[in-house]
Amino acid sequence: MFSLDSFRKDRAQHRQRQCKLPPPRLPPMCVNPAPGGTISRASRDLLKEFPQPKNLLNSVIGRALGISHAKDKLVYVHTNGPKKKKVTLHIKWPKSVEVEGYGSKKIDAERQAAAAACQLFKGWGLLGPRNELFDAAKYRVLADRFGSPADSWWRPEPTMPPTSWRQLNPESIRPGGPGGLSRSLGREEEEDEEEELEEGTIDVTDFLSMTQQDSHTPLRDSRGSSFEMTDDDSAIRALTQFPLPKNLLAKVIQIATSSSTAKNLMQFHTVGTKTKLSTLTLLWPCPMTFVAKGRRKAEAENKAAALACKKLKSLGLVDRNNEPLTHAMYNLASLRELGETQRRPCTIQVPEPILRKIETFLNHYPVESSWIAPELRLQSDDILPLGKDSGPLSDPITGKPYVPLLEAEEVRLSQSLLELWRRRGPVWQEAPQLPVDPHRDTILNAIEQHPVVVISGDTGCGKTTRIPQLLLERYVTEGRGARCNVIITQPRRISAVSVAQRVSHELGPSLRRNVGFQVRLESKPPARGGALLFCTVGILLRKLQSNPSLEGVSHVIVDEVHERDVNTDFLLILLKGLQRLNPALRLVLMSATGDNERFSRYFGGCPVIKVPGFMYPVKEHYLEDILAKLGKHQYLHRHRHHESEDECALDLDLVTDLVLHIDARGEPGGILCFLPGWQEIKGVQQRLQEALGMHESKYLILPVHSNIPMMDQKAIFQQPPVGVRKIVLATNIAETSTTINDIVHVVDSGLHKEERYDLKTKVSCLETVWVSRANVIQRRGRAGRCQSGFAYHLFPRSRLEKMVPFQVPEILRTPLENLVLQAKIHMPEKTAVEFLSKAVDSPNIKAVDEAVILLQEIGVLDQREYLTTLGQRLAHISTEPRLAKAIVLAAIFRCLHPLLVVVSCLTRDPFSSSLQNRAEVDKVKALLSHDSGSDHLAFVRAVAGWEEVLRWQDRSSRENYLEENLLYAPSLRFIHGLIKQFSENIYEAFLVGKPSDCTLASAQCNEYSEEEELVKGVLMAGLYPNLIQVRQGKVTRQGKFKPNSVTYRTKSGNILLHKSTINREATRLRSRWLTYFMAVKSNGSVFVRDSSQVHPLAVLLLTDGDVHIRDDGRRATISLSDSDLLRLEGDSRTVRLLKELRRALGRMVERSLRSELAALPPSVQEEHGQLLALLAELLRGPCGSFDVRKTADD
């Protein structure tokens, strides 16, 4: 006989057997909401400590229990309030406990609850001091303390139901037709965006491939049925199996139907007095009735519900652990239907008149059936020599053709230099004595006697400005000044220019013409003979292309070698090999801090000369001192709490408050503030301008960043007017080689941007990370160069000890494609691995191999690692290889100018974007893009508008245009300079007749510059394989099926579109295919920030590689052989003609690369013109079934 008491006893025993936990449940822990529904400070602090709490909880339980997901052990129950949402998180391991969270959105409330749970886990010892995970063995030991051995949870994953549930879900899925796409832009997407970023998603086709289903297994007895219980033994057994049946039923129905309640689909009707008879009507998955009796109403209902649970399990709708399946598994039929739609090839519809034109062209200009696109390797007998490599040597100092000086001319020039030197006496006396001066003879003798010398000089010793002058002085005073031609490299443009100007001033008017500089977009070379040329490392690398042995150069000084940027490490490889070609050349490596013995060993044990520096006293303040000074005592506890963590978040308000405090109470003098990047610079600048208000005229706020042209950065060296305080906001660009004389205060955020490359995802990540101790020393030194100063470090003293001594060399943490290409230009006979193994720190062989493979994929290298004809052209263009390829193809496809603008804007963003105005910038970009679906064409229109207003010569019009379109004038000037430089590069690569043709609308190279689809297609051809296919439907990691959402698929896997690209919020996509330049990794997700919709026929016709065709004589499919991202279908004639058109375009590219483009025979030019006109018309036509609309959820 069944009784409620025996039922409760059995249920308690069952739970103890399952969990070994006492029956009483702990009271829920609540994350209290602040008044008004906002998140309280305590809640924010929890989320700062646990920024990704749901991931962390899943990881702990997953590792402890050996399962791939923890959905069964973490159950989120949602409650909608009037102003906010409440979530109760039920935790089933290691003990049963509940926590609550609140938020304006569902995901916010879930994260609050999860963060509170993380705090519990940490208190229980399940997380380390830095919230790190333990290994599985340790979790087993910890679990025993709770009476919950992990072994009892070590169960295999539940088997997926062996059937399709088409009839179980009444909701129908409406895909957008063949090739079509639907997407919800409604509330669900907005609320779940953060969930997507935190937990990841899987597209429908991937999910289906992961589920090993037997689709032929029939549904077991899914017809409606009624169970009249004459004895309740079956019900008692069912209740033992399902101790909480009503909860389980509700959860199953809610998950399967995506509803917040199960009341409408699960209804009880109970009658009787002494014996209660309960009838449960279940309307899901089909109408079913279950009847049970009991002494009380609750008992009868529980029995009926248990019978229902038993039935659902027999249908495969409950897993082997008596838990609900995922939402996706309940909707497997819809998933399969949608998956079939996604896999179906898209139909090609080419108008008949265009097909006839293609046939006519191919009949007139047939492509030989045996013709196969070659690898385009450079051959001496079938290609015009390209570039200056095959011509006369270039003078590294002046850039003119190199001709050695005749002996008589050398004597005359040396005598002239000696006379000029003697006349400059008073100017030299005015120069201040520097710590390096007493070591003059030691340094000069070492340089004279040894081919390589390392000079280690502390900050302020004068090595950068004085050693080049000392070399020139010795040569001139010994009567051999004409033989002294020194190239001094600097890591940054601003330091090359400023140091050259400083040295020129110190040498005086008579020798000023002997000092010059050369940086990207700006050059002022010195006169030859007795010359000092300051340049960036990249400039010297290009000079080595045209003069591999540096004939005519007496010394190369590599300054700031300790920074270990990738170009400097590459230069050292070349200079080491250069010693055999030019033994007279003297190499000087100068370093402020660093492992100088390492450089000495690299160059065979060369001497290291240490020069002490001079620094005025600098008083240092650390975070705890700064917070006390600012009266921010409430921050002290928080910062102490996070002291042991590696969090690199910068509080811009704190930076602003500190600068204002220094201004109000500190000593007079300039303030130099080191910030990680451009966004932080703009953020602090805007905050300062808002705080200063009407008094802004008393301050000179100057940003310093590589995005800003040189002419706009020179103001930092100028003395401000009396009563005006200079505030310089800079990245680490101002750390070395640049001295701003009036700086008294340095604010050091302790952070900088560092590029890191993920070999697995092949994605770069620009991360904000802690600087090294060497960086801290350099930054502090900027305050004590010319007077006593103060350094304010926005990190605690304890953080300084945890910082690494030196930065990781850039060559070990960045993509290597450009470096491998440079290696092939300088030493083509060596393999990439062989060449880069000679670096001071050689990169990972796998990283080098990946770079080689990518260059082979884009057609720059052949299988033997030789430059192809395309690679030979790319060698002249100073930008990333894929962007350079796009430029080369644009010259061939006669749409050059817009591609030059796009590449320049991808190098320097023209928009004045900041953390505060990102949404406004995105709106402007969308307007500029019109209906092109392209961030890149938005760049083109922005620059075109700027060029137009410049012609008006009306200042107010220019300012209005900049303000309305949120454009940044210095960046636009830089972009203009880049376009000019690229034009010169293209001319050097024999792709145009003269540089001015590149920007001339009437030139042949711009004949199709107005054809937007062609421009986007050519950009895609250069960036390929950077191609995205938009797919409908996704499944979250938690198993929720979202049919009206989209995923973005690349060759490497799924990515996300960043909010900054216009295609993220587009209400209509004309094409399912997007191209992009760069993907970046942030918080574990891979994002694309710039994208363009591309015509599917452009993808088919313009990409490299082979295509695969299946033809039954009537219909045919064509796809890319190296990717599953494009499958097209059409009638056999259309597919055949498109394949031949593709081959004709490949032949055109090959011909154009094998000779000077402007010198092609007129007949070939005519053929190419007809072909391009045909291509433009084809891409101008309608997309047909490629048209894609994003629709809102019903």
Curated annotation (Swiss-Prot):
<dbReference type="Pfam" id="PF24995">
    <property type="entry name" value="DSRM_2"/>
</dbReference>
<protein>
    <recommendedName>
        <fullName>ATP-dependent RNA helicase DHX30</fullName>
        <ecNumber>3.6.4.13</ecNumber>
    </recommendedName>
</protein>
<comment type="similarity">
    <text>Belongs to the DEAD box helicase family. DEAH subfamily.</text>
</comment>
<feature type="domain" description="Helicase C-terminal">
    <location>
        <begin position="654"/>
        <end position="827"/>
    </location>
</feature>
<feature type="compositionally biased region" description="Basic and acidic residues">
    <location>
        <begin position="1"/>
        <end position="10"/>
    </location>
</feature>
<dbReference type="InterPro" id="IPR001650">
    <property type="entry name" value="Helicase_C-like"/>
</dbReference>
<feature type="domain" description="Helicase ATP-binding">
    <location>
        <begin position="444"/>
        <end position="612"/>
    </location>
</feature>
<feature type="domain" description="DRBM">
    <location>
        <begin position="53"/>
        <end position="121"/>
    </location>
</feature>
<dbReference type="InterPro" id="IPR027417">
    <property type="entry name" value="P-loop_NTPase"/>
</dbReference>
<keyword id="KW-0963">Cytoplasm</keyword>
<dbReference type="Pfam" id="PF07717">
    <property type="entry name" value="OB_NTP_bind"/>
</dbReference>
<dbReference type="GO" id="GO:0005634">
    <property type="term" value="C:nucleus"/>
</dbReference>
<keyword id="KW-0496">Mitochondrion</keyword>
<dbReference type="InterPro" id="IPR007502">
    <property type="entry name" value="Helicase-assoc_dom"/>
</dbReference>
<dbReference type="GO" id="GO:0042645">
    <property type="term" value="C:mitochondrial nucleoid"/>
</dbReference>
<feature type="region of interest" description="Disordered">
    <location>
        <begin position="150"/>
        <end position="199"/>
    </location>
</feature>
<keyword id="KW-0690">Ribosome biogenesis</keyword>
<dbReference type="InterPro" id="IPR056755">
    <property type="entry name" value="DSRM_2"/>
</dbReference>
<feature type="modified residue" description="Phosphoserine">
    <location>
        <position position="380"/>
    </location>
</feature>
<dbReference type="GO" id="GO:0003678">
    <property type="term" value="F:DNA helicase activity"/>
</dbReference>
<comment type="function">
    <text>RNA-dependent helicase. Plays an important role in the assembly of the mitochondrial large ribosomal subunit. Required for optimal function of the zinc-finger antiviral protein ZC3HAV1. Associates with mitochondrial DNA. Involved in nervous system development and differentiation through its involvement in the up-regulation of a number of genes which are required for neurogenesis, including GSC, NCAM1, neurogenin, and NEUROD.</text>
</comment>
<dbReference type="InterPro" id="IPR011709">
    <property type="entry name" value="DEAD-box_helicase_OB_fold"/>
</dbReference>
<dbReference type="GO" id="GO:1902775">
    <property type="term" value="P:mitochondrial large ribosomal subunit assembly"/>
</dbReference>
<dbReference type="Pfam" id="PF00271">
    <property type="entry name" value="Helicase_C"/>
</dbReference>
<feature type="binding site">
    <location>
        <begin position="457"/>
        <end position="464"/>
    </location>
    <ligand>
        <name>ATP</name>
    </ligand>
</feature>
<feature type="modified residue" description="Phosphoserine">
    <location>
        <position position="6"/>
    </location>
</feature>
<keyword id="KW-0347">Helicase</keyword>
<feature type="short sequence motif" description="DEAH box">
    <location>
        <begin position="559"/>
        <end position="562"/>
    </location>
</feature>
<feature type="modified residue" description="Phosphoserine">
    <location>
        <position position="226"/>
    </location>
</feature>
<dbReference type="GO" id="GO:0003723">
    <property type="term" value="F:RNA binding"/>
</dbReference>
<dbReference type="InterPro" id="IPR002464">
    <property type="entry name" value="DNA/RNA_helicase_DEAH_CS"/>
</dbReference>
<dbReference type="Pfam" id="PF00270">
    <property type="entry name" value="DEAD"/>
</dbReference>
<keyword id="KW-0597">Phosphoprotein</keyword>
<keyword id="KW-0067">ATP-binding</keyword>
<dbReference type="InterPro" id="IPR011545">
    <property type="entry name" value="DEAD/DEAH_box_helicase_dom"/>
</dbReference>
<keyword id="KW-0378">Hydrolase</keyword>
<dbReference type="Pfam" id="PF21010">
    <property type="entry name" value="HA2_C"/>
</dbReference>
<dbReference type="GO" id="GO:0003682">
    <property type="term" value="F:chromatin binding"/>
</dbReference>
<keyword id="KW-0694">RNA-binding</keyword>
<feature type="region of interest" description="Disordered">
    <location>
        <begin position="1"/>
        <end position="27"/>
    </location>
</feature>
<dbReference type="GO" id="GO:0035770">
    <property type="term" value="C:ribonucleoprotein granule"/>
</dbReference>
<comment type="subunit">
    <text>Identified in a complex with TFAM and SSBP1. Interacts (via N-terminus) with ZC3HAV1 (via N-terminal domain) in an RNA-independent manner. Found in a complex with GRSF1, DDX28, FASTKD2 and FASTKD5.</text>
</comment>
